[in-house]
Every structure is written in structure tokens, then in C-alpha cells.
Amino acid sequence: AAPEWADYVKTGSHRERPPVQADWWYVRSAAVLRKVAMMGPIGANHMAQQFGGPKDRGVKQNRAVSGSRNIARTILQQLSSCDLIISKHNLAGTVNLGKILTGTGQSMLDDAAHAVRGSAEEKYPGLSGF
């Protein structure tokens, strides 16, 4: 579930307004889960960079800035509490390398992809070759 502060927070310093979609937290959580599956092991800082963008600095040139690390960290904690992701450590167990997908998380992503495959093939006819 989305935290109570999710209705008022911006998704990064590069944004001027908070999100307008009512379900943006759940869409972001699904995107984070997919990114962990594709890019893992990945941490909260690198995840925030994935959701960053150009900051408007007025007359000066735009610069790339990270998204909100609190949002990324909170979503990673929620996914971890649901046993969809776990922390990966080095062989000695002393360094946390980031989050990786569990078997439960992978099966959830596979089920979701299988559920929308039919409608995706109807919308994009050439998709069946992949």
C-alpha cells in the first residue's frame, strides 16, 4: 500500500508538481520490480537514478538529476517485505551488492507477462516473432 505521504510528494527535484495519476505508486512499484529483474543486483541509489530526469535551471543548461531516493528505498523495502526481492551479498557476506529477484517475484512477473501477451499481440502484430 502507498504511504500516506505519497499523495503530496514529488517524484524528484526535477519535477515541478506531484504525480496526477491516483495509482502512480503501484505503477512505480511494478516498474521497480521489473527493473530489479532486468538490472539486478541494483540498489536504491541506482534505482533513483533510473527514475531521474533533466532539471530545469532557468537560463542555464539542464542537468541530469536523480529521482527521489526515499521513494525508491520505500518501494524496495515493501517489495522485500513481500518476499519478491532479496538482498544479494558478496561471497564473504560482508558487502551488500543490491537487490535481486526471488523465485516468487520472477513467477509473478512471468504470470503478468503471460496474462497480457494476447492483447499485446493483437495491438502489435509483429510481436509474435519474439
Regions found by a protein language model. Name each.
Residues 94-130:
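Short, amphipathic alpha-helical interaction segments positioned at domain boundaries
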